[in-house]
């Protein structure tokens, strides 16, 4: 048992990189969520079957550019006055993208339009982007899967504003990373108490678990700066926490880190804090 604990503790140094990758998820999810090449003169619509071919074609082009790690090709579709709900700018987004792609050279993007409508000379679209990356030596053999739902405002063929609606990211490593079921509300009111559970689904046998829960405000500066975490020995099959939303509205990253002798899983979800 002591050898198992020592082995788990030696792997802590990987966690700073893992959490840093998670905290940059939004920025690279932004890359290809939705792009629009020209003004579309149509009535308001929520039927994705009516999405203009120019939109779907451009979406495929942006997915391809992001999958190749071509930041310049991606950023040409963002307005110089681009505004993001997390405080990102074109410059900070480019830095986060380049950093992420160095760590995950084999990343793949796939985006689907969920709904869209016209608002005067603008198009507002809601999309879902799936991001995946297989383990490689450059990322410490971490596998990544992320799903990001976002809303874009497009004017004159460029994105002028983007808001992240929801996100979930899973990082895994090792031969047998724990299967973790996370239970977290998507939205709470300021000051409201909430439950955050990360339950290991499979039997552990004689394995020991180390784990930790993280709650962090979402800020542009955190996209580039790694976050360290101290793991504790878990006496039960997961993490069971009670949190309280801050007194001011905003978004938080809530993460669960679970490690066993032959694998690690990190799950991060976005929690929206709204006014009462």
Model-derived features with residue positions:
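Surface-exposed, charged secondary-structure patches
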Residues: 98-142
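Short beta-strand edge/turn micro-motifs at domain boundaries
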Residues: 140-178
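N-terminal edge beta-strand
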Residues: 167-195
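Short, aromatic- and glycine-rich surface loops/edge beta-strands on solvent-exposed regions
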Residues: 198, 242-262
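Contiguous segments within soluble domain cores/interaction surfaces
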Residues: 187-189, 193-240
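Short, low-complexity N-terminal intrinsically disordered segments enriched in polar/charged residues
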Residues: 32-64, 68
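Short acidic/polar inter-strand loop motif in beta-rich domains
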Residues: 133-135, 259-268
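Short, well-ordered alpha-helical segments enriched in acidic and aromatic residues
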Residues: 67-92
